[in-house]
Amino acid sequence: MKTLTTLILGLALGLSAAAQTAADKVVYHIDNAAMQATKGLRNIRNHLDVAPETQIVVVTHADGVDFLMEGAKDKNNPNIDYGALVSALKARGVRFEVCEITLKNRNLQKGQFSMDAEFTPSGVVRVGRLQAREGYGYIKP
C-alpha cells in the first residue's frame, strides 16, 4: 500500500510539473487587415517578448488575408511593410494561415501571398478546432 501511495504521489507531482511547464497556445483571429493587422502584429510581438515560449497561430479569412499578400503595406501608414513584420514573427515560431475559401470567393491565388503564409481549407473551422480540440486561447485584435 505504501508503494502504491508513493507511486500515485509521484505521478501527481509529475503531472503538476508538466502542466506548469507546458507552453501557452494562442490563436489570433484576423478578418479585417485594415483594422487589425498592424495592431495584431504588434500584440503578437509584445506577447512573445513577455512569453517567448507561447505557440501562436494567426488565422486569417475574408479581408484579413490582405496583409499576407506579397508587397502588402499598412494603408494608413505605408511605411509599415507587413512582409518584414510577418517574416520576423515567423522566425520566432508564429504560424500564419490563410483561408482557402476566401481565396476562392475573392478569386485569389496562393502565389499572390508571402512565402511565410500557409493555407487552411477554412479559416473559421481552423479557429474553432484550435480552440475546441487543441486548447488554444482566442485573441481578436
Q: How should each PLM-predicted stretch be described?
A:
Residues M1-L4:
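Positively charged n-region of N-terminal signal peptides that target proteins for export
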Residues Q20-P141:
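Secreted/extracellular ectodomain signature
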